[in-house]
Amino acid sequence: MQCGLVGKIIKRFEQKGFRLVAMKFLPASEEHLKQHYIDLKDRPFFPGLVKYMNSGPVVAMVWEGLNVVKTGRVMLGETNPADSKPGTIRGDFCIQVGRNIIHGSDSVKSAEKEISLRFKPEELVDYKSCAHDWVYE
């Protein structure tokens, strides 16, 4: 959030043909971060991750579309920005792995869990984008 890249990130997902169905701008509490990243709790970098993520607000988004989790991960690039290709979000906007600017769910199951931590079902907006028929068969 602090880097002023939210609009550029949204633009990339919209240009790909994905549909934004929910978004929130909010603080990332330590409690929430520990729950969100519970699978990493035993890793040596975990305390630093929580401290960094808790240092400012976050923008949580929910995107829908064909293979959005898989394709979204490709668009993000590798977790380590040094391994990310130019043209990916991390390849273009990140330098150090400990200062990653974006998170993407690694599976549909993880996405469902992570979405439920931030959004109520009624906060997900169901609509048909005017670009839908140009993107999908």
UniProtKB/Swiss-Prot annotation:
Output the Gene Ontology terms for molecular function: ATP binding; metal ion binding; nucleoside diphosphate kinase activity
Question: Is Nucleotide-binding among the key words of this record?
Answer: yes
* Co-factor(s): Mg(2+)
Catalytic residues, per the record, are: H103
- What biological-process terms (Gene Ontology) are attached? CTP biosynthetic process; GTP biosynthetic process; regulation of apoptotic process; UTP biosynthetic process
- Where ATP is bound, by residue? F45, R73, T79, R90, N100
Swiss-Prot/TrEMBL keywords: ATP-binding, Kinase, Magnesium, Metal-binding, Nucleotide metabolism, Nucleotide-binding, Transferase
The reaction(s) this protein catalyses: a 2'-deoxyribonucleoside 5'-diphosphate + ATP = a 2'-deoxyribonucleoside 5'-triphosphate + ADP; a ribonucleoside 5'-diphosphate + ATP = a ribonucleoside 5'-triphosphate + ADP
The EC number(s) attached to this protein equal 2.7.4.6
Query: Cross-referenced InterPro entries, in alphabetical order?
Result: NDK-like_dom, NDK-like_dom_sf, Nucleoside_diP_kinase, Nucleoside_diP_kinase_AS
Q: Name one GO cellular component term.
A: extracellular exosome
Q: Which leading EC class covers this enzyme?
A: transferase
Q: Which Pfam families match?
A: NDK (PF00334)
User: Per its UniProt record, what PROSITE patterns does this chain match?
Assistant: NDPK, NDPK_LIKE
Q: What does this protein do?
A: Major role in the synthesis of nucleoside triphosphates other than ATP. The ATP gamma phosphate is transferred to the NDP beta phosphate via a ping-pong mechanism, using a phosphorylated active-site intermediate.
Q: Tell me which family the UniProt entry assigns to this protein.
A: Belongs to the NDK family.
UniProt protein name: Putative nucleoside diphosphate kinase
Q: Whose protein is this, by species? A: Homo sapiens
